[in-house]
């Protein structure tokens, strides 16, 4: 994940680190709780989803809003992109990178002193439940909830200080691991994630970041030539506040299509 501010002296970037293929094993003979079994199913789903997500492209519509001190919108910009996530695998290390090709970019309102938030990568918040990262979080069962008529298990997550985190804040040449905390709505039977709400477990106002909240909603996407139905991000919203500024970006993802790209390396014979 990344975000940064345009036309501002403060530049903030949020990175999701590379993901390693690492399956956590349960000690032989150890009994597992229902919550551990649910997290295990979510681990399996996310590990598969990382590869599924890189096999599709979609249309992304981004709405950027900057708010005044009284809460009214000061500036609003809208853009549309062809969007895809590029997956690379080198020696067992998986890296996810977003690619955006502009379809429509609103003509920028050149207001002096007005900065806009640019947010990238928040659709991949599901990496909290990837096997490589989930051991760095505490999970709590919050019972059941219903979204659009479908039952989900609500699971609270909180990053354990000192453990690996899928996100880090890069600011003025330094990187700060982020202590993410939030709630995920997970299908109890399949481990499919329907929604994630996340933010900072502790304030980072001392370095210029007062608060950050992000919500990602997932929806089932059927494909013509596939018997399986996959759940992909439908909307990702990001709200960021510094002591003096307030932004909200909303990313809507539509028109998912499958595609495949194969590359072949040939060495010319002498």
Give the location of each predicted region:
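N-terminal secretory signal peptides that target proteins for export/translocation
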Residues: 1-12
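Bacterial N-terminal signal peptides
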Residues: 11-25
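Structured extracytoplasmic
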Residues: 29-181, 188-195, 199-235, 239-270
């Amino acid at each position: 994940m990344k975000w940064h501010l345009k036309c501002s002296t403060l530049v903030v970037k949020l990175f999701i680190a590379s993901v390693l293929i690492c399956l956590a094993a349960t000690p032989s003979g150890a009994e597992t709780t229902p919550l551990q079994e649910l997290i295990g199913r979510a681990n399996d789903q996310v590990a598969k989803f990382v590869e599924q997500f890189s096999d599709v492209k979609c249309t992304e519509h981004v709405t950027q809003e900057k708010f005044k001190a009284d809460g009214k919108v000061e500036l609003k910009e809208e853009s549309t992109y062809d969007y895809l996530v590029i997956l690379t695998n080198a020696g067992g290390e998986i890296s996810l990178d977003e690619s955006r090709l502009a379809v429509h970019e609103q003509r920028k309102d050149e207001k002096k002193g007005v900065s806009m938030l640019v947010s990238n990568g928040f659709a991949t918040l599901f990496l909290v439940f990837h096997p490589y990262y989930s051991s760095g979080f505490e999970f709590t069962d919050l019972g059941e909830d219903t979204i659009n008529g479908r039952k989900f298990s609500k699971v609270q997550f909180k990053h354990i200080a000192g453990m690996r985190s899928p996100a880090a804040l890069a600011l003025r040449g330094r990187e700060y691991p982020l202590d993410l905390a939030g709630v995920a709505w997970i299908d109890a039977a399949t481990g499919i994630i329907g929604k994630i709400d996340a933010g900072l477990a502790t304030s980072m106002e001392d370095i210029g970041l007062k608060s950050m909240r992000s919500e990602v909603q997932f929806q089932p996407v059927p494909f013509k030539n596939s018997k399986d139905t996959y759940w992909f991000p439908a909307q990702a919203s990001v709200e960021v506040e510094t002591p003096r500024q307030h932004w909200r970006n909303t990313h809507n993802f539509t028109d998912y299509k499958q595609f495949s790209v194969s590359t072949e390396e040939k060495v010319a014979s002498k």
